[in-house]
Every structure is written in C-alpha cells, then in structure tokens.
Amino acid sequence: MTRNDPIKHFFIWPALLIVLIISIFPLVYSLTTSFMSMRLVPPTPARFVGFGNYIELLSNPRFWHVAGTTTLIAFLSVGLQYVIGLSVALALNARVPGEGLFRFVFLLPMLVAPVAVALIARQVLNPTMGPLNEFMTFLGFPNLPFLTQTSWALGSIIVVEVWQWTPFVILMLLAGLQTLPEDVYEAAALENASAWQQFRDITFPMLLPVSVAVVFIRLIESYKIIDTVFVMTGGGPGISTETLTLFAYQEGFKKFNLGYTSALSFLFLIVITVIGMVYLAILRPYLEKHK
C-alpha cells in the first residue's frame, strides 16, 4: 500500500469516527442538557429553559464559594509543588550522594492512588484517634482540628496534594535541567559567576518553558480535584472545603439535577479556559524573551 493509496481511508475513517462519537457526542449532549430542566429523581420531563440553569448557578453563593475554595487549593498547592520541586530537582541534578535512592523515594508518592493517599491521610489526621494527634498529646500539646476546622482542613488537603504531586514536578524539571547545555555553565564559571548568578541568569530563564508547561498541567489537574477532598473531608466542615468537581458530583449523583450539573460543568470548563489563557498571556513576553 502506497502513501496515496485510497484504501488507507478504510483504515483511518472507522477509527476516527469512533473517537469522534466517544468524545464529541457526550460533549454535545451535555451542552444541550445544560439548557434543559432535567431531573431523574423525581423523574420529570425535559423542559427547555434557555440560560436558566446558568443564571441560577451564577446567582448561587455556593458556586462562588466553591470556586474560590478550588482556586485557593489549586494555586497554593501548585505554588508549593513548584518551589519544592525545583529545589529538589536542582539538588538531584547536582549529583548528590545517594542520588538514585533519593529519586526512588521522591517518586513513590506519585505512584500511589489519590484515594489511597487520602484514606491514609484521613486516618493519620483523625482529630481524636489519629497517630499524629496521639503523638502530639504524648508530647503535651493539645489535639489539633486537622479535618474539623476550616483553615486546618484546607491546609491538610493542600499538604496532601503537595506531598503526592511534587514528585511529578521534580521529574519534569529534572528532565528539563538535564537538557541544558553544559558549555553555558562552563563559560559562566570562567567569568567567576556565583551559583546564585548562574541560577538567576542561566538556569531559571532556560528552564522557563518547562516550568510554564509543568505549572499549567498541575493547575488544570488541581482544579479537577475531587478524590482527596471527598475522602478526607467530604467537603466539610459544612461546605468550607467543597470544590467545583465535588459540587458537580453532589448535584449530579445525589440530587440527579442533570441540567444544572451540565451547566456547572460548562462553567467549570470556561473557568479553566480563562485561567489558562490569562496564565499564558502573562508569561508569553517572558517566553518570547528567553526563547
């Protein structure tokens, strides 16, 4: 079969159609549903309401609260992941003793399922019977409300997210560091540039494209967080740690309000798109400068 042989279409189009059906149909169906009033329990006939679901959602204080909570968790956790990940990647790239062991240990958290990590964290941070509070009580400190007080619960979720996903950042940044040309550093050493000057003027600017990509990927993933929150706090206390995806789960799988949930999903998509566009727009001048 040659490159221009028409028979190739018999192999390409079926696969392409399957992909389109699997990906496009649910998207179109969900968009259509977002303009309908549709409930499964109690079962009610679908009724066109236009932008009614979107208006109701945007006027719901709970939506803005969970959007703010999701943003807080995403930005704080990703920021910490990047700072810690860059520090560890720089250390590993410097060929420290026991580098292979360190790489293995640092990558372990990423290999564990988020639900399993959240279950372990919930047991460890249990405010009454958790090992951490038991140890603190043994040392004479009072029990801390790790999962029962808003600020502590948010902090606990962020710490767990940082612990699990910093290895991904380390892996990506370390790969980027190992592609940087050695001759640039040799020239800087001849100019008696300090380690800080080399990092500021060489390493960080040259690593910027990788950094932008890594932070962008982690931001998108952090906005989709549900498993860690669902298992550790269930969105509580109250709704203080509820995220956008958990809110959608509550509306879709507990209240069976499909139209409202579909509208929420598309607003979530818009939020992610806007954040991504703003993020890339802010960093584009720096990327062009250091290209």
Task: Indicate where each model-derived feature is located.
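A structural signal for multi-pass alpha-helical bundles of membrane permease subunits
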Residues: 4-291
